[in-house]
């Protein structure tokens, strides 16, 4: 089955997947080709029959979510925005930048005149490099998506001159830094109507839910702690909110389609889980519906059967867990080379550090196979003995009374609950383990 995936820079990627593939299979293949490990920040969007933008549920089959027949057209988009310093890969940062650039040009991110000038100069630096007097005025106007006055153009040019010597990657990072401080950063907007039929925009973001007029002028802002419950019924989404008086009020939002309503319901639940929770609860992970065939099969065969099961949410990790997972993945990707450089074993050791032993991936000789097996065992041993929070220091502390031993002393001192079982930590006990450093005479990487 063929899928056409459009990147934020309008480059089209052809992705071939199995006919029964889930959305996750397609996204993983796209990110693998782009060299991106931080997959959890991204999603695949498509356009519904009524023009609504919808997120593909990565845990369900692609063919069951899309209209028509393959090839299916999808868009690679950033689903969860985080602070730029939390992004570990330059490839990930570049896709974030492309998405932000698109949002700026579309007017979805409101900024001050000073910010607009600075961002325009940085965008010029990313596209043209250092200032050149031959750069035409229309090139700057194209970047800003509007006609510029002489004063504004001169301000942008002056800022652009100051950026001489700034690399493209550095300029992109500065753009992300400026935009991440804006009020609407990371907010996903949904077009709705209220109970009286008035057009509104609902913004679902890291801190809460924004209600605006269709020109983005704010009406109300609802923080997550006062949201009791979000539910969906057909084309309607209901939000139960606690007022300052302590009473509850139910807000009704009418959507253009049932799928659009499902999209808003998903956005509220998944965004809250990603930014505000320590881990994704099983209540969110395991919520699903069944089609008629699956419902009958669950009644007469086995209620745990997967036939016809469609998951409501596809979020797997919170922002903290994504960062931790990415650090571990990057650490593991480079650990073999680092181990070989640091190892000073004698020449007869199967762990000897030699250029030939590290560059013979196609060799099937017994000694090379033994080397790779031992290196993999060493990698797993080193990872198992590292703090699960910082991934840098060795484990040397036990949480009491639960007894889990998974953190270093500095991280354990900052935790109020055990990261494994979530039970309350009464005190932390220092322990002395036979660590890999002392056993193998290696330096912790």
Swiss-Prot record:
Domain notes: The RING domain mediates ubiquitination and the neurite outgrowth inhibitory activity. The FERM domain binds phospholipids and mediates lipoprotein receptors recognition at the plasma membrane through their cytoplasmic tails.
Gene3D superfamilies reported for this sequence: 1.20.80.10, Phosphatidylinositol 3-kinase Catalytic Subunit, Chain A, domain 1 (3.10.20.90), Pleckstrin-homology domain (PH domain)/Phosphotyrosine-binding domain (PTB) (2.30.29.30), Zinc/RING finger domain, C3HC4 (zinc finger) (3.30.40.10)
Modification after translation (UniProt): Autoubiquitinated.
GO BP annotations, alphabetical order: cholesterol homeostasis; negative regulation of low-density lipoprotein particle clearance; negative regulation of neuron projection development; nervous system development; positive regulation of protein catabolic process; protein destabilization; protein ubiquitination; regulation of low-density lipoprotein particle receptor catabolic process
Activity regulation comment: Can bind 1 iron ion per dimer. Iron binding seems to decrease LDLR degradation activity.
Keywords: Cell membrane, Cytoplasm, Iron, Membrane, Metal-binding, Transferase, Ubl conjugation, Ubl conjugation pathway, Zinc, Zinc-finger
Annotated PROSITE patterns: FERM_3 (PS50057), ZF_RING_2 (PS50089)
Domain of life: Eukaryota
Span of zinc fingers (RING-type): 387-422
GO CC field: cytoskeleton; cytosol; plasma membrane
Name of the gene: MYLIP
Known pathway: Protein modification; protein ubiquitination
Functional note: E3 ubiquitin-protein ligase that mediates ubiquitination and subsequent proteasomal degradation of myosin regulatory light chain (MRLC), LDLR, VLDLR and LRP8. Activity depends on E2 enzymes of the UBE2D family. Proteasomal degradation of MRLC leads to inhibit neurite outgrowth in presence of NGF by counteracting the stabilization of MRLC by saposin-like protein (CNPY2/MSAP) and reducing CNPY2-stimulated neurite outgrowth. Acts as a sterol-dependent inhibitor of cellular cholesterol uptake by mediating ubiquitination and subsequent degradation of LDLR.
Protein name: E3 ubiquitin-protein ligase MYLIP
Reactions that this protein is recorded to catalyse: S-ubiquitinyl-[E2 ubiquitin-conjugating enzyme]-L-cysteine + [acceptor protein]-L-lysine = [E2 ubiquitin-conjugating enzyme]-L-cysteine + N(6)-ubiquitinyl-[acceptor protein]-L-lysine
Source organism of the structure: Homo sapiens (Human)
């Amino acid at each position: 089955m063929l899928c056409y995936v459009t990147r934020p820079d309008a480059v089209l990627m052809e992705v071939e997947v199995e006919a029964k593939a889930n959305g996750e299979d397609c996204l993983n293949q796209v990110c693998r080709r782009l060299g991106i490990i931080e997959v959890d920040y991204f999603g695949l969007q498509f356009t519904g029959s009524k023009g609504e933008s919808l997120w593909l549920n990565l845990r369900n089959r692609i063919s069951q979510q899309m209209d028509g027949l393959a090839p299916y057209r999808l868009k690679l988009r950033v689903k969860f925005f985080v602070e730029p310093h939390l992004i570990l890969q330059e490839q990930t940062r570049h896709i974030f930048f492309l998405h932000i650039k698109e949002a700026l040009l579309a007017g979805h991110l409101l900024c001050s005149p000073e910010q607009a000038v600075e961002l325009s100069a940085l965008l010029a630096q990313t596209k043209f490099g250092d200032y050149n007097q031959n750069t035409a005025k229309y090139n700057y106007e194209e970047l800003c998506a509007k006609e510029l006055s002489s004063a504004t153009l001169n301000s942008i040019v002056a800022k652009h001159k100051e950026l001489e010597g700034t690399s493209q990657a550095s300029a992109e990072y500065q753009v992300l830094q400026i935009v991440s401080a804006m009020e609407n950063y990371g907010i996903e907007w949904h077009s709705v109507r209220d109970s009286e039929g008035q057009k509104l925009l609902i913004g679902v973001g890291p801190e809460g839910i924004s209600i605006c007029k269709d020109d983005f002028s704010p009406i109300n802002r609802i923080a997550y702690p006062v949201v009791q419950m979000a539910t969906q019924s057909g084309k309607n989404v209901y939000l139960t909110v606690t007022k300052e008086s302590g009473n509850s009020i139910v807000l009704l939002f009418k959507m253009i389609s049932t799928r659009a309503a499902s999209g808003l319901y998903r956005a509220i639940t998944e965004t809250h889980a990603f930014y505000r929770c320590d881990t994704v609860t099983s209540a969110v992970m395991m919520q699903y519906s069944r089609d008629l065939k699956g419902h009958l099969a669950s009644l007469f065969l086995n209620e745990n059967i997967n036939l016809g099961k469609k998951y409501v949410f596809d979020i797997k990790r919170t922002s903290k867990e994504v960062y931790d997972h990415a650090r571990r993945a990057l650490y593991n990707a480079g650990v073999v080379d680092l181990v070989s450089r640091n190892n000073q074993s004698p020449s007869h050791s199967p762990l000897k550090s030699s250029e030939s032993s590290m560059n013979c991936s196609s060799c099937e000789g017994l000694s090379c196979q033994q080397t790779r097996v031992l290196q993999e065992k060493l990698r797993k041993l080193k990872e198992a003995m590292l703090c699960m929070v910082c991934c840098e220091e060795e484990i040397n502390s036990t949480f009491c009374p639960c007894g889990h031993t998974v953190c270093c002393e500095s991280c354990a001192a900052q935790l109020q609950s055990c990261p494994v079982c979530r039970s309350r930590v009464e005190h932390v006990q220092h322990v002395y383990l036979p660590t890999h450093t002392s056993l193998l005479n290696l330096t912790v990487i």
